[in-house]
From Swiss-Prot:
UniProt key word Ribonucleoprotein: no
Residues spanning the membrane: none
Pathway: Mycotoxin biosynthesis
InterPro entries: G-Glutamylcylcotransferase (IPR017939)
Protein name (Swiss-Prot/TrEMBL): Gamma-glutamyl cyclotransferase aclK
Family, as annotated: Belongs to the class-I pyridoxal-phosphate-dependent aminotransferase family.
One of the record's GO molecular function terms: gamma-glutamylcyclotransferase activity
EC number(s) given by UniProt: 4.3.2.9
Organism: Aspergillus oryzae (strain ATCC 42149 / RIB 40)
Gene that this sequence comes from: aclK
Length: 273
């Protein structure tokens, strides 16, 4: 089983160059360069043996049920969905060459340690010209979700579109793109009047709550995320509590009355983290 490496200690030289592995929405040029406002010095398409893409990071029921994360191949988990098929391709991603200060900015923009933790992995460039320039192996920093749901909820069409557009732009193998599309069908919004009423009521309450928490998170990050990009522990605990509460209400109360907001069948979900 593959495992992550020991994370490097913070260095005062914020212009030091590091590789950052994007595998989800940051594959999209618009998300990474425009929304994150980060221009990398290089971009290399890589594979990461021993790891695979998941859509298991807890999102927002009825709107954005899940976001991307990664897991070890064959890692133990609460369901069989965490185990790979014999022919499944390993994780593909884009390694961006950025400064340490830009890496800290990414950590802060992805919630400042609330949902994701840092990991250091080894990746292999796909293209021969990249192998010749950068070597056969790269050490890459990335983020792994600490709030996962199994089986994996279905991602929104918007979010999956960002991943697929980024994968195509990075010239990922067609077989890998097909694998993503096959394994992760998109969430379909409620189709009946009853389900739409339930979704509207749920979103009407939780959207303002999550909006306020998002503003709090970004304000805490702008106020000074520190050397690691993390928000204060009190903010982290508050947001995680709200997320667990929201999904608890969805799983045990709301979905039994109005229908599920994650695209799965009744009784399917478990939130971990």
């Amino acid at each position: 089983m593959a495992s992550s490496l020991e994370l490097p200690k913070f260095e005062p030289d914020r212009d030091r160059l590091v590789w950052y592995l994007a595998y989800g929405s940051n594959l999209s040029s618009q998300t990474f360069r425009e929304d994150r406002q980060i221009t990398p010095q290089a971009a290399v398409t890589i594979t990461v043996p021993g790891w695979r893409l998941t859509l298991s990071s807890a999102g927002f029921p009825y709107r954005e049920p899940s976001f991307a994360s990664i897991v070890n191949v064959g890692s133990a988990g609460p369901t069989d969905e965490k185990h790979d098929g014999p022919c499944e391709l390993p994780l593909h991603g884009t390694a961006y060459l950025i400064t340490w200060s830009q890496w800290i900015k990414i950590v802060a923009s992805e919630g400042g340690g609330i949902v994701y933790k840092e990991a250091l992995l080894r990746g292999q460039p796909i293209q021969p010209q990249d192998q010749q320039r950068w070597g056969a192996e790269l050490s890459v920093l990335t983020l792994v979700s600490t709030m996962e749901r199994w089986p994996e909820p279905r991602p929104s069409q918007r979010y999956m579109g960002l991943i697929l557009d980024g994968a195509r732009a990075a010239d990922f193998p067609a077989s890998y793109i097909a694998q993503i599309r096959h394994k992760h069908p998109c969430y379909q919004p409620p189709s009946t009047t009853w389900e739409r009423i339930g979704a509207t009521l749920f979103l009407g309450f939780w959207t303002p709550v999550l909006t306020l928490l998002s503003l709090l998170t970004h304000a805490a990050a702008r106020a000074g995320p520190g050397d690691d990009g993390h928000v204060p522990e009190g903010v982290r605990a508050l947001v995680r509590f709200a997320m667990f509460t929201m999904w608890w209400v969805h799983d045990l109360i709301w979905s039994r009355i109005w229908g599920r907001g994650d695209g799965l069948f009744p009784g399917a979900m478990q939130l971990n983290g």
